[in-house]
Amino acid sequence: MIIPAIDLIEGQVVRLYQGDYKQKTTFDLSPLSQLKSYQDQGASWLHIVDLTGAKDPDKRQTNLIADLVDGLDANIQVGGGIRSEAQVIELLDIGVKRVVIGSLAVKETALVQSWFEKYGAEAICLALDVNIDEQGEKIVAVSGWQSGGGKTLESLVEAFKPYGLKHALVTDISRDGTLQGANTQLYREIASSYPQIKWQASGGIASLDDVAAVRDSGANGIIIGKALLIENFNVEQAITCWPNS
């Protein structure tokens, strides 16, 4: 499944290079028009990252996200520094279909497990952003990739499996924003180890060949941001390559 994505800072569509706010590209685009275009080309899910909220929880772009949800028919998945149950409730209340939880799942695992029990596994996607070390260990990073969480991807999956974990978004940090292609080996490994989880791949997608490679890796979906913004290909072409199921 193709999941087009936009990142937002203070209402503007941006892309960061490897999560670095200092390496930001701003696009002169209306968030709603851009997402509508993706939807009109056939996307049934859209991914929004609130980078302002990720940096400062007091400045979450909830009103903008509510307007985007209201203006779109596609299902919306939202991430970016979600740190409290109140924020989860707020997003679900405005019509967001799935919230993406990253650092908190590492730092406060029991708290996030309780959200799975309250809101159901369909409403939560774990974001597992990994640095792969020399031994091949998949170490999950936290706090906008500024620090290592010390937990492996597998240990977190095992912690959430009893709570019905269904959706997980995995980014190889070294590929993010680079347009160097996805780490398909990573997705092959996790999809074969945990076939019951719907894996979303993210990071490095530059071409339709990359989309096809991720499709063939066993991942269930692919988050595409920068490649669509710089028009390497469009959503319609991507869906032709990997039809939504």
Swiss-Prot record:
Give the pathway annotation. Answer: Amino-acid biosynthesis; L-histidine biosynthesis; L-histidine from 5-phospho-alpha-D-ribose 1-diphosphate: step 4/9
Q: What are the cysteine partners in each disulfide bond?
A: none
**What keywords does the record list, in alphabetical order?**
Amino-acid biosynthesis, Cytoplasm, Histidine biosynthesis, Isomerase
State whether keyword Transport applies.
Answer: no
Subcellular location, in the record's words?
Cytoplasm
Its EC number is 5.3.1.16
Its UniProt entry gives the catalysed reaction(s) as: 1-(5-phospho-beta-D-ribosyl)-5-[(5-phospho-beta-D-ribosylamino)methylideneamino]imidazole-4-carboxamide = 5-[(5-phospho-1-deoxy-D-ribulos-1-ylimino)methylamino]-1-(5-phospho-beta-D-ribosyl)imidazole-4-carboxamide
InterPro entries listed in its UniProt record: Aldolase_TIM, His_biosynth, HisA_bact_arch, Isoase_HisA-like, Isoase_HisA-like_bact, RibuloseP-bd_barrel
Keyword field contains Isomerase: yes
Active site located where?
7, 129
Which Gene Ontology terms of cellular component type are present? cytoplasm
One GO BP on record is:
L-histidine biosynthetic process
UniProt-recorded Gene Ontology molecular function terms:
1-(5-phosphoribosyl)-5-[(5-phosphoribosylamino)methylideneamino]imidazole-4-carboxamide isomerase activity
* A Pfam family: His_biosynth
Membership in a protein family: Belongs to the HisA/HisF family.
Which PANTHER family does the record cross-reference, listed alphabetically? 1-(5-PHOSPHORIBOSYL)-5-[(5-PHOSPHORIBOSYLAMINO)METHYLIDENEAMINO] IMIDAZOLE-4-CARBOXAMIDE ISOMERASE
Name used for this protein in its record: 1-(5-phosphoribosyl)-5-[(5-phosphoribosylamino)methylideneamino] imidazole-4-carboxamide isomerase
The protein's organism comes out as: Shewanella woodyi (strain ATCC 51908 / MS32)
